[in-house]
Amino acid sequence: MLGFTYYTPTKVAFGKGSVERVGELMNQFGGTRVLIHYGGQSAVRSGVLDRVKKSLDEAGIFHVELGGVVPNPHLAKVREGIELSKANGVDFLLAVGGGSVIDSCKAIAYGLAEPEHDVWELYAGQRKAKACFPVASVLTIAAAGSEMSNSCVITNTDTEEKRAYNDDLARPKFAIMDPELTMTLPDYQTEAGCADIMMHTMERYFVNSGTMELTDALAEGLLRTVMHNAEVLHTDPRNYDARAEVMWASSLAHNGLTGCGSDGGDWMPHLLEHEMGGMFNVTHGAGLAAVWPSWARYVYKDCLPRFVKYAVNVMGVTPGATDEETALAGIAAMEEFYHRIGMPVNFKELGIDPTDEQMAEMAASCARACGGAKGSAKVLHQSDMEAIYKMLK
């Protein structure tokens, strides 16, 4: 087991009715002037936005609102939020939504804390943040794990770049997690969320370093739990217990727990998907599902023991005559699972058809974003990235 630092400062209020605690928790963490950031009209129609505002009003906390966050959140909305927050003396950012809203909130918090700099410089790798305004969330979509993570991803539509920035400064102060708020999600969004949750753990699982018996057991248990409940929700979308299991898994999958003792993870499936999201605006979890089988078949021989372990302990594969046979059976079983929950496993099923030139462009951009090469299961260079994209055709 490699050495690690595990830091998870987010206070979680989980369960039915927890939304009503937002004012109490905001006071506890010193928020006095709050930007409520949200996405589309679902937050309004569901009543959750009114519940949040009522709780803040009862706690005597000033608030201003900014909606309009879209999936693969845009840099332009972040800049709008920074200016609105400055004009209103905002000292705390509250996201009401899923990962896209929380990520947009984190980016606003970075920009607000260092107004002399362009916030995109963080995502472009040009500098590191020195400060960040406090952030919290009322979670309405279980997927990204941003409610407890140090990560946020923003899309620059001018350059068609989707980039991540990770820093503990942006870990939320608290997270309100009521599974009932996810009941009205469309099935596709629910299942894409489950794919995203699983991938956050799988990125940390498929590594070539560290001996992590306990961490592996936690990761495998989380993956089996999400798979089971994803199938439950596919046929019974209002099942509270299944919603609760998936929501809690969302947080544990991306707060660092399932990577303790490893080298930090592989992260190439995410980076490959980021290019697809930047160019084609695909749903993130669905894009990850589409990428993973091709990536896995490209790298598995270089990380064979982990793929065998995954096949047996997570996918329930009976060991074959050879380790390679077992690993490939595990990958095939994963594809079958994705299909059972309505997730794509290639470009066609994802609904995009990139040209050879676009795949080459995505590979070049991906290589630039990761400094030329990246990966733990197998270190990938630009030519490898392009080869994987071609496998998705």
Description of each model-found segment:
Residues T10, K16-G17, G39-G40, V69, ...:
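Fold-independent oxyanion-binding glycine-rich loops
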Residues R51-V52, I82, V101-P115, M148-S149:
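Short Gly/Thr/Asp-enriched flexible loops that form oxyanion-binding sites at enzyme active sites
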Residues F307, V314-K393:
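C-terminal charged capping/lid subdomain of soluble metabolic enzymes
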Residues R204, N208-A333:
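Active-site segments that bind and position negatively charged phosphate/pyrophosphate groups
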Residues E114-T211, K309:
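A glycine/threonine-rich phosphate-anchoring loop and its flanking beta-alpha core
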